[in-house]
């Protein structure tokens, strides 16, 4: 059996982009997907997905599409989860990737033996590959903290991963813990369905409306940016205060950081619900009693249901953790994809950033594929690349000083990151992905409803 192939674990956007680039370079590969369709978390029917019925993209279609495959013109500025899933399916179809995917195949483990990666699917014989790409996603392992006094609380406490639709909130007093984008979305769902909705936040945040002067916020930032970061932060901060006003009036805390220094909260609805009392802002939780939540400011609320929108832990369950160096629950990878310990092991999608990620995944995938190509056909060049990727990682946050938190450890500024990828590509004299795609002249499909979207939770 020819082992000069690449095993890709995961048929979500990260895995599919790697597959496209490998196919462009005529490098054989096999994708393993534990579910029955492509799309990863965007398929709400997948067990364990954090997706919920009301979810939409938080970056605009204009700034979020794959290179060479823009989102359809008839999509709204912020596509729904159904539209994003259709878009991913069409990406796989147009690029001829379905025939390379083994669906309903969960990987039990992957071991490295005699210079090869032995991929062990559940209920099947192991298969050996020369290269391995981990692209199984970072939103499958819930971070579920225990609340003080939870054992005596008679209400329900659950992680947001189990939340699917707002019917569950009917006639309940609901507290959402966490102000990430999922947390504020869920609080907005609770606003019109629950008896009363609350949201608990540890700190103050900057809320970015999805449209600024009628333009998607990320498009506006792209068109008006380009100056020094300190100036952009100052100007954007002033503008946000003009647009949203003094948020402490609504019970929110004043942010302790500059705008752009934390993951953006892209939401135009929560402030509306706070203004109308449909959602009430609360401080961090101190402890629970039998039927109340006691907050750190001493206030209390009777609550029936607590939703913990407390994020997810990075995990690669099929691979021994020793294959990566981990810091603050993040695998330490050069340019977020190259493993300094083993040049035949790559990862894609294990990063958090402040912009649309699909174009970033495209560029990452192309560099992974070109590195594999060098190992396959240009050993002298491959040796140089391997030595280069073993150096300490560069600062990918750019001029932004991100807040000190586990989530922001190794956080990536999109523009800084794309410049670093371009510099890496040009160092080895590689043609750009854009040029390669232009030569292939790929057809484009409009998103159409597929059978898997008929089942709505």
Language model regions located:
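Active-site segment of extracytoplasmic enzymes that catalyze sulfate/phosphate-ester chemistry
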Residues: 63-64
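Terminal hydrophobic/aromatic helix or amphipathic segment near a protein terminus
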Residues: 217-229
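C-terminal catalytic domain of Rieske-type non-heme iron oxygenases
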Residues: 266-267, 400-403
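Extracytosolic helix-loop segments that constitute the early lumenal/periplasmic catalytic or substrate-binding loops
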Residues: 67
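Active-site-proximal substrate-binding core of FAD-dependent oxidoreductases
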Residues: 208-211, 373-401
């Amino acid at each position: 059996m020819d082992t000069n192939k690449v095993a890709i674990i995961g048929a979500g956007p990260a895995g599919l982009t790697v597959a496209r680039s490998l196919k462009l370079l005529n490098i054989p590969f096999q994708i393993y997907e534990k579910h029955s369709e492509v799309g990863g978390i965007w398929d709400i029917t997948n067990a364990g997905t954090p997706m919920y019925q009301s979810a939409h993209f938080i970056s605009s279609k204009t700034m979020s599409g794959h290179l060479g495959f823009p989102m359809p013109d008839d999509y709204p500025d912020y596509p729904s989860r159904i539209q994003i899933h259709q878009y991913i399916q069409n990406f796989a179809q147009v690029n001829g990737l379905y025939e390379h995917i083994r669906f309903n195949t969960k990987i039990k483990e992957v071991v490295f033996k005699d210079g090869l990666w032995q991929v062990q699917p559940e209920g099947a014989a192991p298969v050996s590959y020369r290269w391995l790409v981990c692209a199984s996603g970072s939103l499958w392992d819930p971070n579920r903290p225990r609340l003080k006094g939870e054992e005596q609380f008679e209400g329900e406490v659950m992680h947001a991963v189990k939340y699917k639709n707002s019917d569950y909130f009917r006639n309940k007093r609901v507290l959402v813990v966490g102000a990430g984008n999922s947390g504020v979305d869920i609080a907005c769902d609770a606003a019109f369905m629950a008896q009363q909705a609350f949201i608990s936040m540890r700190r103050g945040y900057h809320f970015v409306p999805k449209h600024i002067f009628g333009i998607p916020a990320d498009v506006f930032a792209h068109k008006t940016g380009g100056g020094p970061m300190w100036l952009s932060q100052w100007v954007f901060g002033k503008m946000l205060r003009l647009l949203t006003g003094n948020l402490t009036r609504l019970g929110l805390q004043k942010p302790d950081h500059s705008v752009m220094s934390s993951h953006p909260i892209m939401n135009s609805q929560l402030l509306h619900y706070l203004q109308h009392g449909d959602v009430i802002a609360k401080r961090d939780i101190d402890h629970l009693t039998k039927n109340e939540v006691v907050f750190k400011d001493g206030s209390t609320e009777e609550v029936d249901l607590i939703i913990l929108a407390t994020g997810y832990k990075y995990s690669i369950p099929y691979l021994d953790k020793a294959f990566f160096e981990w810091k603050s629950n993040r695998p330490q990878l050069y340019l977020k994809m190259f493993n300094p310990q083993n040049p035949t092991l790559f990862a894609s999608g294990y990063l958090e950033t402040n912009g649309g990620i699909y174009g970033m995944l495209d560029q990452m995938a192309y560099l992974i594929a070109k590195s594999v190509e060098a190992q396959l056909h240009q050993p002298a060049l491959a040796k140089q690349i391997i030595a280069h990727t073993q150096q300490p990682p560069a600062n990918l946050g750019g001029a932004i000083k991100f807040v000190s938190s586990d989530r922001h450890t190794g956080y990536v500024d999109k523009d800084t990151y794309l410049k670093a990828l371009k510099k890496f590509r040009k160092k080895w004299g590689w043609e750009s992905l854009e040029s390669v795609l232009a030569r292939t002249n790929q057809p484009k499909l409009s998103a159409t409803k597929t059978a898997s979207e008929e089942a709505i939770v």
